[in-house]
A protein has these predicted regions:
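Structural motif
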Residues: 28-29, 64, 106, 124
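Small/polar loops that bind or transfer phosphate-bearing groups
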Residues: 10, 64-68, 135, 171
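Fold-independent oxyanion-binding glycine-rich loops
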Residues: 11, 33-34, 49-50, 67, ...
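Short amphipathic alpha-helical segments
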Residues: 19-22, 75-79, 121
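Phosphate-bearing ligand-interacting subdomains
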Residues: 37-96
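Hydrophobic, well-ordered beta-alpha structural blocks that scaffold small-molecule cofactor pockets
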Residues: 1-57, 160
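Structural signal for interior beta-strand "rungs" in well-ordered beta-sheet cores
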Residues: 89-188
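Short alpha-helical
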Residues: 13, 71-72, 102
Length: 188
């Protein structure tokens, strides 16, 4: 069976983690301005840089942005959207997304992460390993939540927010748009 082709934007650390999950389902290629065309990373070829997206669109219809910088991820996502790319979600086999949760486009849900019943996650959100988004919690577009952090029931994480590792966003708490929450922080 032939796999669909998928462009992975970013071949850095996070991009490689995304690639490990994506290659289970897709025929992947990297786009990265810092790598030479033809280079292989994790067995995946680099086919160009961001300037090549218009020409790559002729061959690829799917794209996921694996860049940790929220602002840059948003810029690339919007540029690719304008070019007509579609954005599948990459969900690790050990992750759980409730059928009663809402998840946007182009999200990455890494191993052992959970998005529970009634939760909502915006577009191009990165949920690292062990992250939990509890019932009725909301995560805005382009947010990044690092390893083992928990967004509790009814809490809200704003767009472009960055939540460090091992954080707890307590029940009904709000993290504002663009906030940067350090590792091991509890937000009440």
């Amino acid at each position: 069976m032939t796999k669909e082709k998928l462009l992975l934007i970013g071949a850095g650390g996070f991009g490689r983690m995304v690639a490990e999950r994506a290659m289970l389902q897709y025929d992947c290629a990297f786009v990265d301005d810092g790598q030479a065309v033809g280079t292989e990373i994790c067995g995946i070829p680099v086919v160009g840089g961001l300037a090549n997206l218009p020409e790559l669109r002729r061959e690829y219809g799917l794209l996921v942005v694996g860049i940790g910088n929220n602002q840059l991820r948003a810029q690339v996502y919007e540029k690719a959207k304008a070019l007509g790319f579609a954005f599948p979600n990459i969900v690790a086999p050990s992750a759980y997304v409730s059928p009663f949760a809402k998840i946007g486009c182009g999200c990455v849900v890494l191993q052992n992460a959970c998005v529970h019943n009634g939760a909502s996650v915006g577009n191009s959100v990165l949920l690292n390993a062990g992250t939990e988004i509890h019932c009725d919690a909301a995560v805005g577009d382009y947010a990044l939540i690092y390893t083992n952090s928990v967004v509790r029931t009814g809490a809200t994480v704003g767009s472009f927010a960055r939540i460090g590792s091992n954080c707890t966003i307590c029940n009904n708490a709000t993290v504002s748009d663009g906030a940067d929450i350090p590792d091991c922080t509890a937000v009440h």
